[in-house]
């Protein structure tokens, strides 16, 4: 990736709906050049997909937490299959250390959080940390 490719990825991370015409204006490049670069970035897997970020607060899921799963009672693959369909689990990280997994969850109410914890408890020890705020809710990836 050269500097222009890096600029393209930054522009798209800020606004995935940016048109090729708008990119040509920002980058001072021709339309065919930008189109070719975009295709290459997609073909090589650097750009995986175009998405929208949804405000959890705006959709009523203002209660967020991390669930740390320790002492897993079933094989990792089986655990991952069980939690995959649970839509309230936004992110899942397999980690080293005392915990096996960190789950980032978002729910409408404390009752719903309790239900989600009850769903996960059979798989291992669950420790919960409520998210108070997120000083860095999203940061564009800067490529070196």
Enumerate the predicted regions with their spans.
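A compositional/biophysical signature of low hydrophobicity enriched in polar/charged and small residues
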Residues: 1-144
